[in-house]
């Protein structure tokens, strides 16, 4: 019994030390948000969160009853998630939305900058519109009901949203208002260097866990096509 208590205390101490060191070293993430650098190639945490999100959404949808009822194969789900959803929808749509709303001057001076996805700059609203359009094309190609498919897709979306918001946090972007709270962070991208709310983490919790639970509860209470999609 004494050994178990000592061992438990040691584990607890090590865990707290790990968390403390992780918090202290968060500035390294903000200053250099790259997971791996091989010559000119840089793999950023933000890009990794996008990929992880897509993979988890893929496995989630493979097991969803609506996907099975529709009769989509694994290859169909693969195409829908990675080609239609991630590339054409989220990335291309997100980039176009960002450039049209926030990078108009750059777009006018250099129209090809629309395709410079590696420079960053993705709009949530543009990505949402892009995903909707991409799924409409996919549904037309597969001859399936759009709202029937989106009822399954929106249940998986909070998984991606929650993880990508963590990527925004590690990227030091989309930070919140100034705060005097101990939970505030100083982001290198902030020209004023103020302590700010980690709004990305708030959104990760709200758009991730909370939204997933709400949509799951709504889905369990109704079989009407389009209801879950409309709540999303």
Q: What role is predicted for each listed range?
A:
Residues 20-232:
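Hydrophobic, membrane-interfacing alpha helices
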Residues 5-6:
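Polybasic, lysine-rich low-complexity intrinsically disordered segments
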Residues 15-19:
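Short, positively charged and aromatic/hydrophobic N-terminal segments
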């Amino acid at each position: 019994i004494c050994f178990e208590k000592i061992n438990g205390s040691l584990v607890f101490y090590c865990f707290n030390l790990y968390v403390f060191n992780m918090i202290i070293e968060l500035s390294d993430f903000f200053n250099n948000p790259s997971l791996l650098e091989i010559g000119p190639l840089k793999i950023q945490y933000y890009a990794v969160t996008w990929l992880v999100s897509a993979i988890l959404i893929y496995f989630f949808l493979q097991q969803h009853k609506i996907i099975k009822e529709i009769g989509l194969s694994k290859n169909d789900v693969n195409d829908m998630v990675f080609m239609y959803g991630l590339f054409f929808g989220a990335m291309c749509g997100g980039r176009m939305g960002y450039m049209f709303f926030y990078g108009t001057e750059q777009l006018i001076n250099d129209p090809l900058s629309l395709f410079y996805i590696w420079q960053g700059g993705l709009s949530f609203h543009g990505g949402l519109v892009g995903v909707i359009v991409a799924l409409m094309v996919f549904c037309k190609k597969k001859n399936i009901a759009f709202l029937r498919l989106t009822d399954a897709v929106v249940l998986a979306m909070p998984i991606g949203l929650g993880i990508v918001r963590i990527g925004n946090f590690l990227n030091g972007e989309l930070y919140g208002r100034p705060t005097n709270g101990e939970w505030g962070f100083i982001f290198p991208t902030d020209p004023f260097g103020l302590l700010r709310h980690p709004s990305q983490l708030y959104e990760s919790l709200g758009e991730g866990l909370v939204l997933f639970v709400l949509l799951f509860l709504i889905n369990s209470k109704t079989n009407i096509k389009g209801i879950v999609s409309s709540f999303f």
